[in-house]
């Protein structure tokens, strides 16, 4: 297809996508009209668990992903990666129909700004009962923040400019998410302009047009996109040879949400093995570990709640909609719930460690290549979400997807994660609506989870085991 014809088709498909983002995900769900609903609601409740609602959701997702995968096969004009800013602008006004985290961010910041409550130590329940927005915390009312001080300060920074107005703060947090999304798209392009210029536009499009990315950032405003933008900034600095800046940016990412600390060992190994002698490497690894630790510890120290009260550690309790939850449900009748949890944790964490170790062994001769830390980062984050996350959430895929697009749209990493983003969206109506239609699937939690987790993971595993690995050239 010629570029001119491709451009015409692109604009037509952009119009189709915009109509779906507006008609299915925004038109009936204006944030300004719905944000006062207590307790907060989701897509299924807003559409009254209707067949029309579930059909619109599934059809919309399928069409959006159809457009998405079509784009990745075509020659595209340079402005293509930035068309989704229109979609993001539409979703900016939408109620977060897939998760209530946006409200929790705002409530914890209210506690800090108005009542001087440390969000890392204090749950929303500590706010005065008279606070008009307290009940929007819903099931998270007794949970302190599992995030880092960079995120809490960022949320606080937009509280005063809107004079503490709750709706204004929600929109400001959405603005932060969209700004981080735009920064991520630019960083992907600039990284690829150095490592693989021929992939630049497709890499940007692969991230920017992905429906899960757009819905979880522009609509639901998860702070994961801020963490991801800083992770990509760290990779950008690594690619540009700015070693200490790379460590600083990764530390800032960790101080938004702690999961990206899993990338730190691979970044440090790469930076170390660039050096010419063993002496320089040994010295550097001690220096890099020490300085990175200080970059993380010093900012969090004034707000740290103590190990016993740290929400990051408490978040591992319980499980749902995940492989771990399915295993616990299968074993608890024989072993009891606590033992079943222990068995599944040891099993899945062991499998995760084995996969990461095997990948590290495969890449042992490429530790000074730019693709090595990116591939290892993808491996540890992707398989964490797929295997060991006690509760699976679709936005967890932002972590690994941001790295997958840097490895090329024909790579196993990208294809598997792209399919994962599709199944993560399609499984939502099953868990939220279909199981309500058929209460047997709610009452028989094991069967309900087997079906849901199969929808979520089996297509992904098929792609992984049937796709040949591509090897990036040395950069």
Question: Where on the chain are the PLM-derived regions?
Answer:
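Transmembrane helical bundles and short interhelical boundary loops of multi-pass, membrane-embedded
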Residues: 2-56, 273, 283-288, 296-384, ...
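Transmembrane-helix motifs of polytopic, lipid-linked glycan transferases
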Residues: 13-14, 61-71, 171-195, 228-229, ...
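Loop-to-helix entry region of an early transmembrane alpha helix in multi-pass inner-membrane enzymes
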Residues: 50-54, 149, 153, 163-186, ...
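Transmembrane-helix signature of polytopic, membrane-embedded enzymes
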Residues: 75-82, 185-210
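Intramembrane catalytic core of multi-pass membrane enzymes that act on lipidic substrates
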Residues: 76-178
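Multi-pass, polyprenyl lipid-linked donor-dependent membrane glycosyltransferases
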Residues: 175-179, 195, 204-232, 237, ...
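Membrane-interface alpha helices of multi-pass inner-membrane proteins
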Residues: 214-217, 233-237, 244-268, 379-387
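Perimembrane helix-loop-helix junctions
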Residues: 263-293
């Amino acid at each position: 297809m010629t570029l001119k014809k491709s451009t015409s088709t692109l604009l037509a498909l952009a119009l189709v996508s915009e109509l779906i983002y507006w008609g299915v995900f925004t038109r009936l769900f204006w944030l300004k009209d719905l944000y006062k609903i207590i307790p907060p609601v989701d897509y299924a409740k807003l559409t009254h668990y209707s067949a029309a609602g579930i059909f619109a959701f599934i059809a919309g997702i399928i069409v959006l992903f159809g457009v998405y995968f079509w784009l990745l096969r075509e020659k595209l004009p340079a402005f293509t990666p930035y068309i989704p800013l229109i979609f993001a602008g539409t979703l900016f006004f939408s109620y977060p129909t897939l998760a209530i985290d946006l409200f929790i961010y705002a409530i914890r910041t209210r506690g800090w700004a108005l009542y001087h409550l440390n969000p890392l130590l204090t749950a929303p329940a500590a706010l005065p009962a008279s606070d008009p927005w307290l009940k929007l915390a819903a099931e998270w009312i007794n949970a302190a923040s599992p995030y880092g001080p960079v995120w809490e300060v960022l949320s606080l920074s937009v509280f005063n400019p809107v004079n503490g107005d709750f709706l204004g703060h929600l929109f400001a947090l959405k603005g932060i998410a969209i700004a981080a999304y735009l920064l991520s798209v630019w960083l992907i392009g600039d990284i690829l302009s150095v490592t693989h210029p021929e992939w630049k536009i497709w890499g940007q499009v692969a991230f920017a047009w992905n429906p899960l990315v757009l819905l979880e950032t522009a609509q639901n405003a998860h702070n994961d996109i801020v963490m991801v933008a800083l992770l990509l900034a760290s990779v950008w600095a690594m690619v540009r040879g700015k070693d200490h800046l790379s460590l600083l940016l990764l530390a800032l990412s960790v101080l938004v949400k702690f999961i990206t600390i899993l990338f730190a060992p691979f970044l440090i190994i790469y930076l170390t093995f660039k050096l010419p002698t063993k002496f320089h490497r040994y010295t550097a690894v001690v220096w890099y570990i020490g300085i990175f630790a200080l970059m993380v510890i010093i900012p969090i120290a004034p707000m740290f709640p103590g190990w016993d009260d740290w929400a990051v550690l408490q978040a591992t309790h319980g499980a749902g909609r995940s492989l771990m939850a399915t295993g616990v449900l299968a074993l608890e009748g024989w072993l009891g719930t606590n033992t079943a949890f222990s068995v599944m944790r040891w099993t899945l964490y062991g499998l995760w460690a084995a996969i990461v170790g095997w990948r590290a062994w495969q890449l042992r001769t490429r530790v000074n290549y730019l693709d090595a830390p990116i591939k290892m980062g993808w491996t540890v984050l992707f398989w964490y979400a797929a295997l060991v996350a006690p509760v699976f959430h679709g936005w967890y895929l932002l972590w690994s997807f941001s790295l997958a697009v840097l490895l090329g749209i024909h790579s196993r990493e990208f294809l598997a994660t792209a399919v994962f983003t599709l199944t993560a969206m399609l499984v939502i109506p099953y868990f939220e609506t279909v199981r309500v239609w058929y209460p047997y699937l709610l009452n028989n939690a094991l069967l309900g989870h087997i079906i849901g987790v199969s929808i979520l993971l089996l297509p992904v595993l098929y792609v992984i085991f049937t796709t040949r690995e591509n090897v990036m050239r040395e950069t």
